[in-house]
């Protein structure tokens, strides 16, 4: 498998995670272990699963981790929508 850092999708998901960390710094303190934590974990999981998949030996294993990454992306999207609607 190739180096995950060479993948455009990994770079974009890494940037997304960094932005989520920046944005959630402004979330209320009482959300530190709630929405803030869940959103950060989902966002960082996207790039992490792409990286882990690149370390696997077979294409089906890699595809499985991309699928998990997609699930994390959907989860992060929901938490962004929730944060928006709670304002």
Model regions: which residues?
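Amphipathic alpha-helical assembly/interaction segments
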Residues: 1-87
